[in-house]
């Protein structure tokens, strides 16, 4: 009921407060290596540095290719995560599953727990077959998730099926994103990690609206959330098309050449 929701929200707040307190008390303050130029603000200096990083990217074509693949499939991942609760709670007549709030909360909590072990699994898999191949495997699973969400979850067993689907989401959710970041780290120059990761984050946020837009348009056109979910397979297919063409070894060689 309402008390369970209140406890859930309070526990999340205490979690963030606890780790924020550790940051405030334990993290050593470091002063800027370079002082802010005269007449500049932190905002203007940041945008100039972002532009400089963008111009430098021409020296790393494989990294750019990887970023394109990442932006595509990550938009799909983020949108699935964002709309899954809406899809699960919506009534069957709208193409949803019709889950009760208590059941939905239980699935969400289960996903957070299983995702931890999923991240460990993908870390081991990446050591075995490589980071890029691990991401490709995860994208096939993500594609399978949206296909099953579209075609399944309709009968009397839909609650149990959604729990099982949640396990698959949890397994690939943390792992695919963590491996993506670690692979990007191998494709950028040493000593410029902050610059390139800033570009990585800004570019990611700049395209994050496309997934919800596609989902919403498909839902409006076809009148069912299931078509909205199915439309997200575009991002995973696009990622699967681009990612195999990324030459990780050449990207690392480019980094050595321009470091």
Describe each region flagged by the PLM.
Residues 1-14, 217-236:
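A membrane-interface helix-boundary motif in multi-pass transporters
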Residues 15-26, 230-259:
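Multi-pass alpha-helical transporter architecture, strongest
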Residues 28-67, 94:
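Juxtamembrane intracellular "pre-TM" segments in multi-pass secondary transporters
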Residues 82-103:
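Short amphipathic helix-loop junctions that connect adjacent transmembrane helices
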Residues 101-102, 190-200:
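Loop-to-transmembrane helix entry/capping segments in MFS-fold secondary transporters
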Residues 117-131, 219:
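Helix-to-loop junctions at the C-terminal end of transmembrane segments
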Residues 140-156:
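C-terminal ends and interior cores of transmembrane alpha-helices
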Residues 158-175:
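Hydrophobic core of transmembrane alpha-helices in multi-pass small-molecule transporters
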């Amino acid at each position: 009921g309402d008390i369970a929701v209140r406890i859930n929200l309070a526990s999340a707040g205490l979690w963030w407060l606890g780790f924020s307190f550790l940051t405030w008390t334990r993290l050593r303050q470091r002063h800027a290596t370079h002082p802010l130029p005269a007449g500049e603000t932190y905002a203007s200096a940041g945008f100039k540095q972002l532009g400089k990083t963008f111009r430098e990217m021409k020296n790393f074509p494989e990294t750019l290719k990887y970023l394109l693949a990442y932006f595509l499939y990550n938009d799909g991942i983020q949108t699935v995560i964002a709309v899954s609760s809406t899809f699960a709670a919506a009534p069957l007549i709208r193409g949803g599953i019709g889950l009760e709030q208590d059941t939905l909360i239980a699935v969400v909590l289960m996903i957070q727990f299983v995702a931890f072990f999923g991240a460990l699994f993908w870390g081991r898999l990446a050591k075995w077959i490589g980071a890029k191949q691990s991401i490709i495997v995860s994208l096939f699973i993500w594609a399978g998730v949206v296909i099953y969400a579209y075609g399944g979850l309709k009968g009397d067993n839909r609650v149990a099926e959604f729990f099982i689907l949640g396990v698959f989401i949890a397994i690939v959710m943390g792992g695919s994103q963590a491996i993506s970041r670690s692979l990007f780290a191998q494709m950028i120059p040493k000593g410029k990690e902050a610059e390139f990761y800033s570009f990585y984050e800004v570019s990611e946020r700049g395209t994050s609206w496309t997934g919800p837009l596609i989902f919403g348009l498909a839902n409006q056109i076809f009148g069912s959330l299931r078509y909205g979910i199915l439309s997200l397979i575009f991002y995973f297919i696009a990622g699967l098309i681009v990612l195999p063409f990324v030459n990780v070894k050449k990207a690392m060689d480019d980094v050595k050449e321009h470091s």
